[in-house]
Amino acid sequence: MIKPLSYLNVADNSGARELMCIRALGGSYRESANIGDVIIAVVKDALPNMPVKRSDIVRAVIVRTRKGIRRENGMAIRFDDNAAVIINKEGNPRGTRVFGPIARELRDKNFTKIVSLAPEVL
């Protein structure tokens, strides 16, 4: 569960290292976001000489949360960190690699490009 002012790691090679959530998209009174949801975030830490700079406002899709999710078959899955992948307006990732495992729910939400780049899908 990611709320405004929550910090997330970046799970791609776009140049950003850490994001801070500003807003969860999908409704005027939406308070939190979970795996597969799109957020608006600000880059708090970034690598030098990369396309994404510090203090840039970006869109990102959440790929891992510590709270986790419960699947319809009764299985619960949670991760060790909160992480997101930076995307563009069309929903494609800005980086060319994705690090760490991601949840299968991203495939259901039509983020197939991120799923294909991921080394492990849980």
From Swiss-Prot:
<comment type="function">
    <text>Binds to 23S rRNA.</text>
</comment>
<keyword id="KW-0934">Plastid</keyword>
<protein>
    <recommendedName>
        <fullName>Large ribosomal subunit protein uL14c</fullName>
    </recommendedName>
</protein>
<dbReference type="GO" id="GO:0009507">
    <property type="term" value="C:chloroplast"/>
</dbReference>
<dbReference type="GO" id="GO:0006412">
    <property type="term" value="P:translation"/>
</dbReference>
<keyword id="KW-0694">RNA-binding</keyword>
<dbReference type="InterPro" id="IPR036853">
    <property type="entry name" value="Ribosomal_uL14_sf"/>
</dbReference>
<keyword id="KW-0689">Ribosomal protein</keyword>
<dbReference type="GO" id="GO:0070180">
    <property type="term" value="F:large ribosomal subunit rRNA binding"/>
</dbReference>
<comment type="similarity">
    <text>Belongs to the universal ribosomal protein uL14 family.</text>
</comment>
<dbReference type="InterPro" id="IPR000218">
    <property type="entry name" value="Ribosomal_uL14"/>
</dbReference>
<dbReference type="GO" id="GO:0022625">
    <property type="term" value="C:cytosolic large ribosomal subunit"/>
</dbReference>
<keyword id="KW-0699">rRNA-binding</keyword>
<keyword id="KW-0150">Chloroplast</keyword>
<comment type="subunit">
    <text>Part of the 50S ribosomal subunit.</text>
</comment>
<dbReference type="GO" id="GO:0003735">
    <property type="term" value="F:structural constituent of ribosome"/>
</dbReference>
<keyword id="KW-0687">Ribonucleoprotein</keyword>
<dbReference type="InterPro" id="IPR019972">
    <property type="entry name" value="Ribosomal_uL14_CS"/>
</dbReference>
<dbReference type="InterPro" id="IPR005745">
    <property type="entry name" value="Ribosomal_uL14_bac-type"/>
</dbReference>
<dbReference type="Pfam" id="PF00238">
    <property type="entry name" value="Ribosomal_L14"/>
</dbReference>
